[in-house]
């Protein structure tokens, strides 16, 4: 049996651009890809914190250090510049692997610069007013 678990998460990134006429995908700053262990072409889920939209697409590598989070193609109808998003990738792993898998969690600021790295998918962004759910157990 395989289990599907969170592998990577870029938490509360700010969408910098949306291009309806570009062929699908999400463009992500190469620094963020490295930090989150994401590869070009990898499947990601996008959760729009601003409006609740959820979608899946694939990664395109963006210019390193640019802070780009670009929504391309039809998804630009759902996700807009300035929206806060969570980008999540998952891995299918065996039961044994699942018990030791530690996700790569990347926290960013309003300019999509890395402000924290970790493995706790429920940890709030460092320095923010966010709180962990009182029912959540720390990783």
UniProtKB/Swiss-Prot annotation:
**Chief localisation class:** cytoplasm
Which top-level enzyme class is recorded in the Swiss-Prot or TrEMBL entry? lyase
Which GO molecular function annotations are given, in alphabetical order? Answer: aspartate 1-decarboxylase activity
> A Pfam family for this UniProt protein?
Asp_decarbox
What kind of modification does the protein receive after translation? Is synthesized initially as an inactive proenzyme, which is activated by self-cleavage at a specific serine bond to produce a beta-subunit with a hydroxyl group at its C-terminus and an alpha-subunit with a pyruvoyl group at its N-terminus.
The record lists the catalysed reaction(s) as:
L-aspartate + H(+) = beta-alanine + CO2
Residues of the region (Disordered) are: 117-139
Q: In which pathway does it act?
A: Cofactor biosynthesis; (R)-pantothenate biosynthesis; beta-alanine from L-aspartate: step 1/1
Q: Which GO terms describe its cellular component?
A: cytosol
Which family, according to UniProt? Belongs to the PanD family.
Name of protein = Aspartate 1-decarboxylase
One GO term under biological process is: pantothenate biosynthetic process
Q: What InterPro entries does its record include?
A: Asp_de-COase-like_dom_sf, Asp_decarbox
- Write out the function statement from the record: Catalyzes the pyruvoyl-dependent decarboxylation of aspartate to produce beta-alanine.
Query: Cofactor: bound how, per the entry note?
Result: Binds 1 pyruvoyl group covalently per subunit.
Cofactor dependency: pyruvate
- Report which superkingdom the organism of origin falls in: Bacteria
Protein localization: Cytoplasm
This enzyme's EC code(s): 4.1.1.11
**Annotated source species:** Streptomyces coelicolor (strain ATCC BAA-471 / A3(2) / M145)
State which gene encodes it: panD
* Subunit organization: Heterooctamer of four alpha and four beta subunits.
Q: Which UniProt keywords apply?
A: Autocatalytic cleavage, Cytoplasm, Decarboxylase, Lyase, Pantothenate biosynthesis, Pyruvate, Schiff base, Zymogen
Task: Identify residues that carry Pyruvic acid (Ser).
Answer: 25
Active site residues per record? 25 (schiff-base intermediate with substrate), 58 (proton donor)
Q: Does the keyword Lyase apply?
A: yes
């Amino acid at each position: 049996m395989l289990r599907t678990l969170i592998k990577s998460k870029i938490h509360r990134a700010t969408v910098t651009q949306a291009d309806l006429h570009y062929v699908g995908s999400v463009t992500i700053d190469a620094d963020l890809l490295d930090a989150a262990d994401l590869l070009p072409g990898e499947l990601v889920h996008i959760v729009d914190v601003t409006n609740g939209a959820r979608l899946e697409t694939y990664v395109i590598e963006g210019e390193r250090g640019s802070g780009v989070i670009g929504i391309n193609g039809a998804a630009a109808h759902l996700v807009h510049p300035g929206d806060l998003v969570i980008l999540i990738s998952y891995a299918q792993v065996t039961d044994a692997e699942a018990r030791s898998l530690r996700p790569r969690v990347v926290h960013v600021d309003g300019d999509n610069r890395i402000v924290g790295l970790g493995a706790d998918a429920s940890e709030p962004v460092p320095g923010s007013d966010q709180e962990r759910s009182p029912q959540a157990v720390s990783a």
